[in-house]
Each structure stands twice: as C-alpha cells, then as structure tokens.
C-alpha cells in the first residue's frame, strides 16, 4: 500500500489514541470526585426518564404508522434506503469499504512490520487505562445510585 495511505491511517490511530486518553481522564475525574459522581448519577437518572418518555412517543408513532397502509409502505421505502446507506457508511462484512475498512487497515498498520507498529504499545496502554478508569467510575456511580433512588 502507498506510504501516504499508511500515514493517513497512523493519523487515525493517533486520533483514536487521544480519544482513549480524553475519555480516561473524564472517567478518572468522575471516579475520584464524589460530587462529580453524584451529579453524573443524577444526570443518568434524568436521561433514563427522558428515554422512557421518548420510547413512549416512539411506540405511539409506530402504532400510528403501522395502522396506515400508505404510511407503512412509505416508511418501509425510507428504511430500505437508510439500511443501504448505513451499509455503505459502516462497511461490509469483508471490510472492503466504509468504517469497517478503516478499522481493518488501522489494525494491519499496527501489526509487526507495519508502518504504525511503534504506535501499538501506546494505543494498548491508553486503551487499558481508559477501561480501568471506566470501571472505577462505574463503581462510584453504582454507589451513588442507591442514594438517588431512595
């Protein structure tokens, strides 16, 4: 593969690595700060309420559409187009295009002998740091949920 393509994938890996680092810092801040953990738990509680309201509205809309043949035919046509576009954007099972292709090539890039080989240890370390702090933050949030729901 041309060098410029590998360089492009190395930039994607850099972006992904910085995303891990940013999210790890956010999760660490939540995990070590009681006030942030409590506010985050409250936010999750309120978001859950909104999602319940949204799901009720969605259910009612689906019932209305399914009861009307013309609307049903129209919505099926829309969803077929959405599914086709989603496949185009996210890629196929063989990862020949779309986001799946980017993931496959980025994985190939960090393999031994690949152009991005030197980025693999940092990417792995930052990903593991993110998961460590994510689980610590989730544990803190779990402690706070009992305070909110009582």
Swiss-Prot record:
The keyword Signal applies. Keywords: Signal. Residues 1-28 form the signal peptide. It comes from the Archaea. This is Uncharacterized protein AF_2120. The lineage of its organism: Archaea, Methanobacteriati, Methanobacteriota, Archaeoglobi, Archaeoglobales.
């Amino acid at each position: 593969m041309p060098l410029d393509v590998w360089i492009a994938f190395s930039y994607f890996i850099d972006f992904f690595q910085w995303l891990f680092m940013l999210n790890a810092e956010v999760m660490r801040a939540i995990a070590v700060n009681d006030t942030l953990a409590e506010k985050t738990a409250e936010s999750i509680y309120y978001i859950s309420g909104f999602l319940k309201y949204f799901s009720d509205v969605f259910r009612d809309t689906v019932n209305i559409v399914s009861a009307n043949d013309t609307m049903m035919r129209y919505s099926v046509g829309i969803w077929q187009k959405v599914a086709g576009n989603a496949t185009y954007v996210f890629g196929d099972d063989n990862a020949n295009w779309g986001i799946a292709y980017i993931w496959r090539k980025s994985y190939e890039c960090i393999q031994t002998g690949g152009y991005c080989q030197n980025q693999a240890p940092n990417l792995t370390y930052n990903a593991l740091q993110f998961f460590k702090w994510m689980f610590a933050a989730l544990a803190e949030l779990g402690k706070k949920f009992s305070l909110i729901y009582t």
